[in-house]
């Protein structure tokens, strides 16, 4: 049989997509998002930061199985202090993201910051506009950051209406990333966290069903090094520094 010819010992373990540092691995779009979270924790550890991660959102196609992949990868997430907290709705998840950016300001904190990933389908972006806009006005932590992951069903294959989330993100003053390949879900996600930390903004990222539900063999890239111009913390700094929203002017 084919399995006898190859030999079980020659087959890589299923979780190599999360543990392998280099080489070629197979993963789906939702698994790439899990890998991205683990790589962010690895980036922070390499930089000497003791960060935590937080994932929260509400399931819906094309991100309907993202929570399943997070539960399956639970031991890997736990090993990197990444918590998964499914929300009652997308609004609550966005509010959780705002609170997580205050972590290092708490006297009892044990982390240097918390990076947060929100997820939801297009209508979730629509209904959460108030929470997203207010969270973005509060800002992000320099050692945390917020990435808002929207799953868009352009063809209305499994939704009541078609949706395109860029407009909702732009309306809330979020920059938007639009990865086109499985490996870009990882690289764009890491860039999004770096951008959020530097700019003080929450960062939107979208994916269509044809990508997030697909799978591919990809070559794992080395962890990136992002060049950041010096940031001077002033009274007008855009990062989260106080318990009240920054002046939108």
Listing of model-derived features with the role each one plays in the protein:
Residues 1-182, 208-211, 224-225:
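Thiamine diphosphate
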Residues 206-239:
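Terminal amphipathic helices with adjacent charged low-complexity linkers/tails
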Residues 182-216:
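Internal alpha/beta core interface subdomains
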Residues 240-249:
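Single conserved hydrophobic/aromatic residue that forms the stacking wall/gate
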Residues 171-176, 202-204, 235-236:
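A short, terminal or domain-edge coil/loop segment
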Residues 172-175, 189, 216-220:
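Extended, well-folded catalytic/binding cores that form a central cleft or groove in large enzyme
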Residues 138-141, 198, 244:
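Alpha-helix C-cap/termination motif
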